[in-house]
UniProtKB/Swiss-Prot annotation:
Reaction catalysed by this enzyme: uridine(54) in tRNA + (6R)-5,10-methylene-5,6,7,8-tetrahydrofolate + NADH + H(+) = 5-methyluridine(54) in tRNA + (6S)-5,6,7,8-tetrahydrofolate + NAD(+); uridine(54) in tRNA + (6R)-5,10-methylene-5,6,7,8-tetrahydrofolate + NADPH + H(+) = 5-methyluridine(54) in tRNA + (6S)-5,6,7,8-tetrahydrofolate + NADP(+)
Record-linked Gene3D superfamilies: FAD/NAD(P)-binding domain
Protein name: Methylenetetrahydrofolate--tRNA-(uracil-5-)-methyltransferase TrmFO
EC number assigned by the record: 2.1.1.74
EC class (word): transferase
Intracellular or extracellular location(s): Cytoplasm
Amino acid sequence: MLNKEVIVIGAGLAGCEAAWQIANSGVEVKLVEMRPIHSTPAHHTSEFGELVCSNSFGALSTDRAAGLLQEELRTFNSLIINTADEFSVPAGGALAVDRSKFSKSLTQTLSNHPLVEIKRFEQLDLPDKNRITVIATGPLTSNELANKLKNFTGLDSCHFFDAASPIIYGETINYDIAFRASRYDKGDPAYLNCPMNKIDYLNFRNALIEAEQATLKDFEKESANFFEACLPIEEMARRGVDTMRYGPLKSIGLWNPKWGDLFDRENRLKKRPHAIVQLRKEDLKGKLLNMVGFQTNLKWSEQKRIFRMIPGLEKAEFVRFGVMHRNTFLESPKLLLPTLQFLKRENLFAAGQITGTEGYAAAASGGLLAGLNASLLANNKSPVTFPDESMIGALMNFISNKNEIMSQQKKNKFQPMPASFGLVPELNNKIKDKKLRYKAYQKRSLEVLKEFKKVLDSSFEKDHILV
């Protein structure tokens, strides 16, 4: 007989969302978090939902895949997105947050929920078979639990190298050189921009290539397996002279009014920087700034020396240096149903980045689905899948055994996937214009989710407080 209380292992974004959805359905939940008893190479606090990499959830606009995913989460009263909205900071057209206030709020909200019991210890094994459990331990799952999952699934977990960017004290930046602007003047001038001429850029690139890197003690005997969407800046420098310029250091769409008339072609060609380093606010007042796209595994002394070569950052003081760590994820298409239940055990769910979704909103969406389905199972009801036309449904299909591409091409190596319109079904009436097509995807998704939510709500008792 199943114990009605649900166990959620891991209080990251997916775990917090799962616990919230379960508790708000009227089911008791035990939320297990190993920090601060046992920390990780990337975490700095014991707060829930700590953002160890960027502080950005991606584009806000619903005609962008990331923005649509955020809006879908709002439809289901997502704790993660609601909290991100509450503690957002200016970031042009993106949703970025004050990471400290964000994680503290998550911790307080769940700690104060009457149906949530917080337990601080390292989970070393899978809970008993009669316990409904959500595994949301994230990409930094402890070695002990990762080995237990390996034994349970019969498969080795996958991994890649991930890294975090440095954070700088805003007051130590030279604002005579750095200027505020957003690319193409979209939204508020939320980014601080440090322009580089060609000589600056080439010297900077050479320094990155020759710099001494920190040792990854767990991987000294392994070749680097980087996640292409989050490459270390020194790896980009090694890949080619202009790789950084076509990535995080691209200057297109950024202009300082001090340089004169943007629409004077001769002036524009003369004054346009060879490259630009961008910094994004970490807090509302801009006291702390994150170096956008500057994930790195350089030694801290090298980071300080080389990043001070950037014009405007000559006297920069660092709140936090960049670090690299191992990210673990499951080969989910061989293990999970689209409901996020394990094929081998129907009362065991997985959610978040450990399943192979990429991005904060995607992690929350996994927590949302796993939490809803754990609640249904606790009430002796059948788990659900999100509509294929929704971004949540498309992502869950991709990471589950419903992923037809994976089933047909067994040799393909499963890699993490962010929200993408390439995952959703084609429209009945094809639209050539990309912007109009994306808007049509958005309209279709929100319409089907509205109907889906009505059906889902009816699955829960009226006295429950789900969504």
